[in-house]
Amino acid sequence: MKTIVVCSGGLDSVSLAHKVAAEQQLIGLVSFDYGQRHRKELDFAAACAKRLGVPHEIIDITTIGKHLTGSALTDDVDVPDGHYAEETMKATVVPNRNAIMLAIAFGLAAAQKADAVAVAVHGGDHFIYPDCRPGFIDAFQQMQNQALDGYASVSLYAPFVMTSKADIVTDGARHKTPFAETWSCYKGGERHCGRCGTCVERREAFHLAGVEDPTDYEDPDFWVTATSGFSAQEVK
């Protein structure tokens, strides 16, 4: 199956790229510059494409992104510290982000005669990101079936949608994903902060998976406090 992977450069999507390269026919990676403050993640996506020997496209949608106001990822709003399940983490939502990116990715896939678009949404995203939940994935596939009817048949491959980030770490280790060559931190500094929701989830995932975390965090122990009182199980 010829597959294009939507790759941000983060742990999840880079692990997915390595999985697809091992199990399917990976024909390229596509990334999106939407004006995110952690744009450095795109460098890690480019490195992944080079490592796997496939083309890499960075689609500039900053003109769209600047209109999706109110998010800590694109606006002058502080990125909150803590666990993803906390109410404050809603500040990291970029409205309709995945729907916009996937619509473009499906267009690319149809033009390139690909069979599938792969996306690394996972169970840990369900807390606050509605466009990462199973209902969205199913509905998007149905919509694309109509949008491309008679022209192309492209499947949405989301193998992690019902699994935890710890499961992704386990799967990534199996496919020899170089975790040190991935970027998660929403703050986009020189090092992973260790305090934002995605850093906390990343650190916890390695712990739960029993896999050594090679990440250099500014605050490597904050995750313990942040995760106390929260279950790693997903909100379905």
Curated annotation (Swiss-Prot):
Q: Which family does it belong to?
A: Belongs to the QueC family.
**Residues binding Zn(2+):** 185, 193, 196, 199
Output the GO biological process annotations, alphabetical, semicolon-separated.
queuosine biosynthetic process
- Protein residues bound to ATP: 7-17
Catalysed reactions, as listed in the record: 7-carboxy-7-deazaguanine + NH4(+) + ATP = 7-cyano-7-deazaguanine + ADP + phosphate + H2O + H(+)
**Origin species:** Rhizobium rhizogenes (strain K84 / ATCC BAA-868)
Pathway, according to UniProt? Answer: Purine metabolism; 7-cyano-7-deazaguanine biosynthesis
Give the domain of life.
Bacteria
- HAMAP family assigned: QueC
How is the cofactor bound, as the UniProt entry phrases it? Binds 1 zinc ion per subunit.
Protein name, per record: 7-cyano-7-deazaguanine synthase
Q: Which GO terms describe its molecular function?
A: ATP binding; ligase activity, forming carbon-nitrogen bonds; zinc ion binding
